[in-house]
A protein has these predicted regions:
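Catalytic core of Fe(II)/2-oxoglutarate
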Residues: 55-56, 63-74, 83-224
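Amphipathic alpha-helical recognition patches that constitute DNA-binding helices
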Residues: 48, 77, 146
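Short acidic (Asp/Glu) patches
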Residues: 11, 32-33, 59-66
């Protein structure tokens, strides 16, 4: 679950919201990262409090690269973990990938322990995610909790520029033991069902994105036709039709 409007939670959350938008804090993060003129996101798009439970995971991905409203460049992820107790063996540890599409993908793990802060740049290669949470039966009351803060700039270096995009996911590969001749176990079948369902979810998300873009294109086209240029095109088509009609041969 996600709560983007953390200020509405009151108390310490409101104090956190005050702290991260203060110029002193933004300048400190700029000094640490070398990225000047950082901007706080008052909308917390995609950020805020995050909580994940047993069986959940997050496929490797790079984040959306422009602010949906301000069109700022997204530059930094800052994640603070809120878990007094966690082990890598339970899954859910942050995975930083070199390239999840590559056979030799290198993965670094960060255990999501309480008060641990991770800062990394948001680029076209900042692949990250976390593996499926599989808690021991006696610890199923636990959840993976964090607060995610994203920071922006009005400009970014030319060599880092890319077309505007939403979050880009890469589906996890099938387990290495699933080879020809292997007899599927119940666990294997369950894992295959999960993999297929995940791909279906990504396809559905892409179809929705395409439908939304098509609707926006249709609205823009309608607005253009309704304007002066649209009226000129309409009259031009009428004149052309009459001109062509004058040379048509009538029925015999």
């Amino acid at each position: 679950s996600v709560v983007e409007k953390i200020r509405a939670l009151g108390g310490e959350w409101a104090a956190l919201d005050d702290a991260i938008q203060a110029r002193g804090f933004l300048d400190l993060v700029s000094r640490i990262t070398g990225i000047p003129d950082l901007l706080y996101d008052p909308w917390y798009f995609g950020g805020g409090t995050h909580e994940n439970r047993e069986g959940q995971d997050l496929d490797p991905h790079v984040d959306f690269n422009r602010h949906p409203v301000e069109r700022w460049h997204r530059r930094l992820n800052l994640i603070v973990y809120l878990n007094p107790e966690w082990q890598d063996a339970w899954g859910g540890s942050l995975q930083l990938h070199s390239d999840p599409r590559a056979p030799d993908d290198r993965v670094s793990l960060v255990t999501p322990l309480y008060n641990r802060c991770v800062i990394f740049e948001t680029t076209e290669t900042s692949w990250h995610g976390f593996s499926r949470i599989a808690l021991p039966p006696e610890r199923r009351d636990l959840s993976r909790r964090s607060v995610a803060l994203y920071f922006y700039t009005r400009e970014r270096p030319a060599e880092e520029l890319a077309d505007t995009h939403s979050t880009i996911y890469v589906n996890r590969p099938l387990p290495g033991h699933l080879q020809a001749g292997h007899v599927l176990t119940d666990a294997d079948v369950a894992q295959l069902h999960i993999a297929v369902a995940r791909r279906d979810q990504h396809n559905e998300r892409l179809y929705k994105d395409l439908s939304r873009l098509n609707a926006q294109l249709e609205q823009a086209t309608a607005a253009l036709h309704a304007g002066r240029l649209g009226r000129l095109r309409y009259f031009a088509r009428r004149v052309l039709a009459r001109f062509q009609g004058s040379f048509m041969i009538g029925p015999g």
